[in-house]
Amino acid sequence: MELLLVAIAGCTAMDVDAITVKRSEPARFDVTCSGNSTRSVNGNHITDIQVDFDVEFPDSEGGRAAADVLEIAIRKSHDRLCTVTRTVELPTPVGARLRGQ
């Protein structure tokens, strides 16, 4: 479970940073991802996945420009850029096979 949450956080953090850093380096950029491990008749899975951003930019023209695009960058990452999040949200079959058989 933890590895999937780290992958989501890392993927979306890279997207958001790539968009905002064009305007300013952040003074603080922390991203956390949480979820609930669930066991059901359908097997183990994660529910209620949440990505939280704690970002601060300097009080400068570039910092304000980066802050202005922050919400848009987060939305873009979630809606179409982050491959990990998109794969989790869109049902994607995963096959498993043993090589040589």
Regions found by a protein language model. Give the residues of each.
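Extended beta-strand/beta-hairpin segments
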Residues: 1-6, 16-101
